Amino acid sequence: MNNKFYQLTVISAENFIFSNLVKKSNITGSEGNLGILPGHAPLITKIKPGLIHIISSKNIEEYIYLSGGILEINSNVVTVLADTAIRGKEIDEKKAIESKKNAEELILKSKERHEYIRAVIELSKAIAKLRVCKLSNK
């Protein structure tokens, strides 16, 4: 492998999602957005609900929704272990819109702090799914 690309693997609890050489990826880490290029310093961090934007070695763009998990970078090998990962083209937009509406309603109705926090997490996941869906279909 040369220094223009690195191996990226995305695995969810349910499925093997992606494995290929890539030029670049961007992912939502616990401390903010991470841009990953070949030769990135070793790192292990939590990832928040959001997306990973991938540019393959053949300049093909792909977006994958991630519900959270762990990111490991080590010697031009990047591994994402996600709780849930869904390719953008596989996301049901109508379901995501419905999930967003339900979460918004739960936020308004929540009486306990833990209910509110759970609803906010569900809202962030639904918004991330919608974003991935829109980016994948443009």
From Swiss-Prot:
Q: Its biological function?
A: Produces ATP from ADP in the presence of a proton gradient across the membrane.
The reply on keyword Chaperone is no
CDD domains according to UniProt? F1-ATPase_delta
Q: How does it sit in the membrane?
A: Peripheral membrane protein
Q: Which InterPro entries match?
A: ATP_F1_dsu/esu_C_sf (IPR036794), ATP_synth_F1_dsu/esu (IPR001469), ATP_synth_F1_dsu/esu_N (IPR020546), ATP_synth_F1_esu_C (IPR020547), ATPsynth_dsu/esu_N (IPR036771)
UniProt xrefs under Pfam families: ATP-synt_DE (PF00401), ATP-synt_DE_N (PF02823)
* Name of the gene this protein is made from: atpC
The entry's family comment says:
Belongs to the ATPase epsilon chain family.
Q: What is this protein called?
A: ATP synthase epsilon chain
Can you name one GO molecular function term for this protein?
A: ATP binding
Kindly give the Gene3D superfamilies that the UniProt entry links to this protein: ATP synthase delta/epsilon subunit, C-terminal domain, F0F1 ATP synthase delta/epsilon subunit, N-terminal
> What GO cellular-component annotations does this UniProt entry give?
plasma membrane; proton-transporting ATP synthase complex
Q: Does the keyword Glycoprotein apply?
A: no
